[in-house]
């Protein structure tokens, strides 16, 4: 990056106007001034008395390289000649009380490996990208009418080396990306990778928003990781936290000794739930810092999306003893989304929001917040409560499985089976399932079948694909040894087949956000806890029939209404022996019966497996073919003979 300095108009703009390339002004930039090579340092510290740059190059002497205050509103700058890359540094800030505090650079592009906390001078330009084809293809697609299966991942605990050390960005590219491609995931969502001091914050309590964490390597190493993802056709989404930040002494908290990036009002400054500080989203300098940061990750790291963390915490704050909406946050989120989509109209901006705030995914010009996706937390909570209930009692909470369809089209939803649900004593998805060993696996297969056939894009946390038995342990890697056990191998095979089926079946994603894409066949069979529905694609004849049985009872010749009087094939049955099931499948082509049922034109009689999902597809034949004419005649003959009987 080339520094933009000595431009008073541009510096003043940072305080009063939109300045979305503030990373070009602030931070440490290699520069040539008056023919001399060195580094230009620029920082915002509005209430500092004095400021200097310190590091190994001056033996951390705050009196040697004092900075100049270049705007009345508190921008400080200094050019230091003959400093090179990889030098470490901090700002020594003299507060209004005369105390000297050391702070890392808010705009630093790299930092020391924890537990050290200094910033590192590094020019991140120069990586040669190879993902033009990825972006060319992405522009031709509508994000809403494509399959989306997201693999949520914590970089430090997916897999570790035998000695317990972490894989680097480049090593993870070799290990993880082929694995994801083999499992047919379309995107990876990585828990925050901004620099953060505490491993167990999972990255959600950051100190260096412009610095990809040095735990796993350098900025160019992470660029390589993203580049490789794109080569394999996998999009990269980052968790991003613009609502609050950690209070470690070297970070943003009380940056110049007074509230700078956080609110001055003590009522709303502190985030008491997480022990962090809330960003002052009404302050122009803070908005420019955050929105520039989003665009920085897009520009320099070719990121495809953000999952914006804790939106509910931003939208509402507790003021004067009661919860109120935060209009600063509302305005900020709208401005953020407008800026992002002006840069890339196909970018993924996902709100992690558990509230009923209206129009989260509506455009700002329609009064919305401007996101294009929202996590469906209500679906997740209802479905998991239903699955955790003993099967014989599920009929009493039947509505938990049907309620989501009443609001499924109010937003562009992603269905999340996320990290939050498999940690802190909540158990793994597999262990949430009631019953014996076999029943747990059967019900998890059933849950995944329902998950992939319900309207909405999909997100699954790592380990769920093979039935991780223990809940997530963030200091350890996944239990890869489970592949030694037959049922886990079967689960893994089932998951790969299910997600492959999802990706090649347009009815399961083409009309995710249209009422036309879903129709109940039977939503009211609570006594048997069986649900059946139709998923539809753009083409009228592109349909799938889904039947889910949430009890252990097997039903023979169970009647299911179907929209067309024709033949149907069972294209997936979670009870197949190959998946660890009992083998109650429908091998033969199913002949529909012309008698209407479930308000449908016809019906089929099928075997309903225990704790199973069955997916049927109409048999398609070329119009006017002899084979088709013969099948129609056979169907008519069967219908006639039944009427005669």
UniProtKB/Swiss-Prot annotation:
One of its GO terms (biological process) is glycogen biosynthetic process. It comes from the Bacteria. Pathway: Glycan biosynthesis; glycogen biosynthesis. SUPFAM superfamilies: (Trans)glycosidases, Glycosyl hydrolase domain. CDD domains: AmyAc_Glg_BE, E_set_GBE_prok_N. Disulfide bonds: none annotated. It catalyses: Transfers a segment of a (1->4)-alpha-D-glucan chain to a primary hydroxy group in a similar glucan chain. The keyword Oxidoreductase does not apply. Its EC number is 2.4.1.18. Residues 621-645 are annotated as: Disordered. Keywords: Carbohydrate metabolism, Glycogen biosynthesis, Glycogen metabolism, Glycosyltransferase, Transferase. The keyword Transmembrane helix does not apply. Residues 626-635 have a biased composition (Basic and acidic residues). GO terms for cellular component: cytosol. Monomer. Catalyzes the formation of the alpha-1,6-glucosidic linkages in glycogen by scission of a 1,4-alpha-linked oligosaccharide from growing alpha-1,4-glucan chains and the subsequent attachment of the oligosaccharide to the alpha-1,6 position. NCBIfam families: branching_enzym (TIGR01515), PRK05402.1 (NF003811), PRK12313.1 (NF008967). This is 1,4-alpha-glucan branching enzyme GlgB. It comes from Bacillus cytotoxicus (strain DSM 22905 / CIP 110041 / 391-98 / NVH 391-98). The gene is glgB.
